[in-house]
């Protein structure tokens, strides 16, 4: 063996040993461990660089910051509701819905709110027209949290409204994700700051150039106006959400809420805001921000949050519980379908038990590896009787699930491992037959713009594409 061969073998050994030590020094799920080993072993040096920014777990100090907020008596209210549900079977006629609500009360202290008025929004034109009107009518405060807040025509138009309201004395706070809004420079916010408003980047860049926590993204989209009107769902702020991007028409689902669920959105915003800003700018859970609200509708719901700061993958647990409680049908819309074993098995059990399971995903990719992994998982569910629909009328970005037309969820969480484990997400879980049926009707209408992806469809794909699907599946725990 010559010297060069010895050096190469030595470097391979050192790289492999370093990969094993690096990955196993932090507890993580087995699938993610193997995926990171694959990256570190087969991409020497580059793999370690990628791991440094994307693979390290969130620090315990940061977890403490996110967990330690005083949440305006929410814990006590959740405990009261748990006790009430234990002795009262009249609120939930369906035992499975009661069990779902208890799951969130136990794991997330997510209180059940009643008497909400909910509007379902599926186009950017409707969403942003209504949002602008609500912002202009704000009297006391505007609290906004988005993954993406772009410096483009729509972003600048909304910013002008925020500046105007700040000049009028309305409290304006904007929280945006540093990675999602990476193309929006600090100077974009200058006039808002001069008017008295504030903007902050969640998990911002160190020294303005390096983001050491870029793998942990605040993917939530929250708007709260005067503690009375709230928005949550899939739309970010940018021209592409009006159909002006390269992906064409944008199909998403968002909720406009009036009622007590808005106070849950407010509490979530405060927790995220206070964990981001210095103590000087932290907000106190004052009655001003949590007004007493009249009953405006008939919808009951829970606002559920999840993230790497939690011990439980709460939204995923809710998805699994809903799937297992289905008796007739499950309709899922998601741009990215990369389920872990628990979700995959739940869907297989449902389909093989006679439940009609339909999954709708986009027909075009916006992330190559993610889309190929989505194709892999979709194809493998066909054998279990699951129907797969590819949305062709633009890009499908909605994140919804409807079960039996009686329960549903809308929010920011995709059906993928990133949303389950790494992102900070928020979803509304809705206990209302009318709203659930509306979402089901929307699904049916969307099918008119879909291609049914059956076995024949996938058989036509090239071997190269199938190879990319299998390779992407190996990386799925870290995509």
Question: At which residue positions do the language-model features occur?
Answer:
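Catalytic-core elements of nucleic-acid end-processing and repair enzymes
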Residues: 399
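Histidine/acidic-residue-rich catalytic or RNA/ligand-binding cores of hydrolases
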Residues: 342-344, 371-373, 403
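Helical hairpin unit composed of two closely spaced alpha helices linked by a short loop
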Residues: 326, 336-358, 362, 367
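N-terminal localization/anchoring segments of enzymes in phospholipid and broader phosphate metabolism
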Residues: 1-317, 321, 325, 349, ...
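Short alpha-helical functional segments enriched in proximate histidine and acidic residues
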Residues: 333
